[in-house]
């Protein structure tokens, strides 16, 4: 993969109506993320970091501006096409995991592959390999309720990586992890950004993690500022 932009936004803004008032959460944001680049976004609670991730990932629509993922303008796509593009090009790690409770760890990780019609044996092989890489080779057949918070987070990270997307977005990825496991996740991001040119966009309060990224941006008063 070349160092082209895997994600970009121009003049991005988001506002919400609260009664007769309109509250501007984000305003005039511009961002470009290239293949293999790792970018951290920091900011105080309530600054709009998760809102920004949802806009960049096509989970919400901006009030102003546009987002391009893998060269496709998200607002120009219908819901189905947008969903297929996200599944193919984007991995997303939510702060609270969003694992399917009735499925095992390996079944959860297989899900993006099965949606993309990967044969079941290949899907299971790739899912198992990733779960082993995040230290869960012994927990393949456990359901989310049988896993700790940190283990569920690692399953979510494996699920985000299994489709080999060009971009992975992570919302507080190390919040429930001990130092050793968090360092392992950071090393995995470093390895994938170098070897596979996977780009990572990380929202975090963990300044140690942020400092290990290629760039750090602060979301302040609705604007992104390089720090």
From Swiss-Prot:
Tree of life domain: Bacteria
Positions contributing to ATP binding: 43-50
Name of encoding gene: lolD
Gene Ontology molecular function: any one: ATP hydrolysis activity
UniProt-listed Enzyme Commission number(s): 7.6.2.-
Name listed for the protein in its UniProt record: Lipoprotein-releasing system ATP-binding protein LolD
UniProt record, GO biological process: lipoprotein localization to outer membrane; protein localization to outer membrane
Main location: membrane
Cleaved signal peptide residues: none
CDD domains attached to this UniProt entry: ABC_MJ0796_LolCDE_FtsE (cd03255)
Alphabetical UniProt keywords: ATP-binding, Cell inner membrane, Cell membrane, Membrane, Nucleotide-binding, Translocase, Transport
Family: Belongs to the ABC transporter superfamily. Lipoprotein translocase (TC 3.A.1.125) family.
Function text: Part of the ABC transporter complex LolCDE involved in the translocation of mature outer membrane-directed lipoproteins, from the inner membrane to the periplasmic chaperone, LolA. Responsible for the formation of the LolA-lipoprotein complex in an ATP-dependent manner.
Membrane topology annotation: Peripheral membrane protein
Domain ABC transporter: 7-227
Places the protein is found: Cell inner membrane
């Amino acid at each position: 993969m070349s160092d082209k932009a895997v994600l970009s936004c121009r003049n991005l803004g988001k506002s919400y109506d609260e009664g007769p008032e309109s509250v501007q959460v984000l305003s005039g944001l511009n961002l470009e993320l290239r293949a293999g680049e790792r970018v951290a976004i920091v900011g105080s609670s309530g600054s709009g970091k998760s809102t920004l991730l949802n806009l960049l990932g096509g989970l919400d629509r901006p009030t102003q501006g546009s987002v391009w993922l893998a060269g496709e303008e998200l607002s120009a796509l219908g819901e189905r096409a947008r969903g297929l593009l996200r599944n193919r090009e984007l991995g997303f790690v939510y702060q609270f995991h969003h694992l399917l409770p009735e499925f095992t760890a390996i079944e959860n990780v297989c899900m993006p592959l099965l949606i993309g019609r990967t044969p079941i044996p290949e899907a299971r092989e790739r899912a198992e390999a990733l779960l082993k890489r995040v230290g869960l080779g012994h927990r393949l057949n456990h359901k989310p309720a049988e896993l700790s918070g940190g283990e569920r987070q690692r399953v979510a990270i494996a699920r985000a990586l299994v489709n080999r997307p060009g971009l992975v977005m992570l919302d507080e990825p190390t919040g429930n992890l001990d130092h050793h496991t968090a360092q392992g996740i950071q090393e995995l991001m470093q390895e994938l950004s170098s070897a596979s040119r996977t780009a990572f966009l990380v929202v975090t309060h963990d300044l140690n993690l942020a400092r290990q990224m290629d760039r750090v941006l602060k979301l302040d008063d609705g604007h992104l500022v390089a720090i």
